[in-house]
């Protein structure tokens, strides 16, 4: 496994509570997120209770503290984070929702994060109930499918099929840490 205390870089695909908790466990890390996501969670968008419900105030405060500790870096739009890791601004689920393409032994794997929660969202253009902008979310499904190319290279953020489709990174981590460079079945 990886010791969180030794992690240097963390990419935050968005700032919902289920994705930014436990930032304190990474004391040496520099964090990266879309600039528009930080603007959204610290600005006018949060005056709307509906938009605010997916964020915990203490998490937002922790993100702002990282800015003041010079441990937050902002990116905008699409680009390359490091060789073999590209980021894509998708939006929809949150204002700054992004996804990643990571090169693996079997080819580029598209990590959708919450741009796609479940395969059925993309298959049926079925919007997820937690969203910032439905039209952007629906268009994002098409963008994600295009960027992934083959469905077997698409990894939605919360679909149980993912844990059934990829092996554990090592014994004892089944369902928790997966080896996305290998696929057990064609999804």
Regions found by a protein language model. Name each.
Residues 1-2, 6-8, 36-89, 135-151:
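Metallo-beta-lactamase
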Residues 5, 25, 67-119:
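Catalytic core of the metallo-beta-lactamase
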Residues 185-187:
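Conserved small/polar residues in nucleotide/adenosyl-binding loops
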Residues 112-140:
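A hydrophobic, small-residue-rich beta->alpha segment in the mid-to-C-terminal subdomain
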Residues 11, 109-111, 155:
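Residue-level marker for buried hydrophobic side chains located in beta-strands
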């Amino acid at each position: 496994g990886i010791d969180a205390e030794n992690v240097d870089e963390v990419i935050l695909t968005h700032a919902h509570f289920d994705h930014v908790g436990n930032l304190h466990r990474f004391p040496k890390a520099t964090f990266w997120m879309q600039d528009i996501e930080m603007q959204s969670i610290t600005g006018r968008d949060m005056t709307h209770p509906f938009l605010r419900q997916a964020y915990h105030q203490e998490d937002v405060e922790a993100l702002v503290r990282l800015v003041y500790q010079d441990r937050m870096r902002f990116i905008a739009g699409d680009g390359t984070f490091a060789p073999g890791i590209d980021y894509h601004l998708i939006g929809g689920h949150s204002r700054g929702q992004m996804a990643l393409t990571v090169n693996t032994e079997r080819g580029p794997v598209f990590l959708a994060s919450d741009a796609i929660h479940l395969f059925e969202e993309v298959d049926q253009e079925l919007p997820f109930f937690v969203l910032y902008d439905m039209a952007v979310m629906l268009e994002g499904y098409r963008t994600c499918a295009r960027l992934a190319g083959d469905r077997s290279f698409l990894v939605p953020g919360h679909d149980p099929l993912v844990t059934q489709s990829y092996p554990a990174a090592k014994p004892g981590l089944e369902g928790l840490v997966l080896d996305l460079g290998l696929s057990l079945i064609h999804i």
